[in-house]
Amino acid sequence: MAKSGTKSLRILVTNDDGIHAPGLKVLEKIAHKLSRDVWVVAPEDEQSGSAHSLSLANPLRVRKLTARKYAVRGTPSDCVLMAVRHILKDEQPDLVVSGINRGQNIADDVTYSGTIAAAMEGTQLGIPSIALSQAFGFSGSANVKWSTAEHFAPDILKKLIAAGWPEEVLININFPDVVPGSVTGIEVTRQGKRDQSLVRVEERIDARNNPYYWLGFERILSNPPQGTDLRAIYESRISITPLHMDLTHQKTAKALNDALGTLAQPKRRPRSASRKK
């Protein structure tokens, strides 16, 4: 982002909750505090849990809502691709912001999240990208404290933009389930890990006596490790986690290379015999 000042930045806003989601409206307001050049390209319908998927078996349909706002019948990754490669192809975005998600995206959530996937897509396309999510508690998603993200996000984004971060890295921001005055701080964290025994499959019966199922997570109080995104949200802090696109575990790669020994050594291709004239 070489442009001086945020007001000259071209910002792309997207999400996974859909074009009519309240969190998208909040993020639009935040983006307009940072720049005059804000574009919105978001899914026509909710795409929560779509992860980093692309629509390869179906065509993308694009609906223009206003001069700078589009709905795409596709995934969050589709939306970013459509924006960068088509809608804004003549002058690409300087920044992608995705969210604000209804619910936290921390720990293992990052592998499922369409919100984070949109930021991943932006990162893959060489554009600095940030995912933002607002946690909600046991009272349910009807009581999401959007004011917390709206209050803190503008200054956080300005400082992140000024500082910059490496290519192949995206920024994942999560706001705790408290009102702005009850936030206890801001912490740069590492990705935590959930207890996968909390994943549940709930069976129900429809009107024709056929079973159907819902996937979900049990919500319990826990004591996550210090320094993790889980702990920060648990203690009412804003969590900022840099996520790296390269998922290779280098220590294991070296150990496997040592274990395989000569099998892991590349073989030289034999030279082809020169033709006789």
From Swiss-Prot:
It holds the Pfam family SurE. Coiled coil: none annotated. Signal peptide: none annotated. The keyword Metal-binding applies. It is found in: Cytoplasm. It catalyses: a ribonucleoside 5'-phosphate + H2O = a ribonucleoside + phosphate. Gene3D superfamilies: Survival protein SurE-like phosphatase/nucleotidase. Binds 1 divalent metal cation per subunit. Keywords: Cytoplasm, Hydrolase, Metal-binding, Nucleotide-binding. GO terms for molecular function: 3'-nucleotidase activity; 5'-nucleotidase activity; exopolyphosphatase activity; metal ion binding; nucleotide binding. Its main location: cytoplasm. Its cofactor is a divalent metal cation. One of its GO terms (cellular component) is cytoplasm. Its EC number is 3.1.3.5. A divalent metal cation binds at D16, D17, S48, N101. Nucleotidase that shows phosphatase activity on nucleoside 5'-monophosphates. PANTHER family: 5'-NUCLEOTIDASE SURE (PTHR30457), 5'_3'-NUCLEOTIDASE SURE (PTHR30457:SF12). Belongs to the SurE nucleotidase family. This is 5'-nucleotidase SurE. The gene is surE.
